Amino acid sequence: MSGHSKWHTIRRAKSANDQRRGQLFTKLARDITIATREGGSGDPELNFRLRLAIEKARANNMPNENIQRAIERGLGKSNEAAIEEIFYEGYGPGGVAILIEAATDNRNRTSSDVRATFNKNGGSPGEPGSVSWMFEQKGLITVDLSATKRDPDELQLLAIDAGADDVIVDDETLEIYCEWTQLNAVRQALLDQGVPISNAEKIMRAKTLIQPDEKDALAALRLIEKLEDLDDVQKVYSNLDITTELVERFDS
């Protein structure tokens, strides 16, 4: 398993307890709310981003009533405060660039929490544009290789034929990257070929990765974990080269 895959597997395992599961449902609901509003429709057949958000919620056993409530909030049919999507930027130990995607009903609270987390964990918050230029918007499709008997090389060729511009293969997963605007087409082409897709989403991918020394890399990973644990933070992206060895050292 690659370092990035192993890191996300560990994070999912830590979300298994009740408190973290409640936090996960909150984050999934906000994804659905924002997707509904940005897509202008509560119908997943007409709103691809919403469809992906609902699929992810259901994969995590989120109750249907929670999903519907999040859609209604996105349509403005709820008395709850509006949710807005905000990006924050900064640097971690070792000069690691960090880009944070947040969803909040209180911008001041979220800004304060993000800034404090940077400052308490050896990082420094940055101004808008300070690191975002190091990332590009991509679609990411993940295939669980244990769910199929097909050869990874065959799946890699299928992904490229479907329109992928990069494919990373390891022992347990296939990570397929494509242009965000092509995600629906690539995903559907793979499904038509019987490829078992475990996840599909929009991400911000670092254009290049860096490898600071182990001390700084571990400290940067610790900062990333603390940021991911914030209630209003949906995703944290970085240009840290998260190797399997680094994750194993972090988790030991």
Swiss-Prot record:
It holds the Pfam family TACO1_YebC_N. GO terms for molecular function: DNA binding. InterPro entries: Integrase-like_N, TACO1_YebC-like_2nd/3rd_dom, TACO1_YebC_N, Transcrip_reg_TACO1-like, Transcrip_reg_TACO1-like_dom3, YebC-like. It comes from the Bacteria. One of its GO terms (biological process) is regulation of DNA-templated transcription. GO terms for cellular component: cytosol. Residues 1-22 are annotated as: Disordered. Keywords: Cytoplasm, DNA-binding, Transcription, Transcription regulation. Residues 1-14 have a biased composition (Basic residues). It is found in: Cytoplasm. This is Probable transcriptional regulatory protein Cagg_2594. It comes from Chloroflexus aggregans (strain MD-66 / DSM 9485).
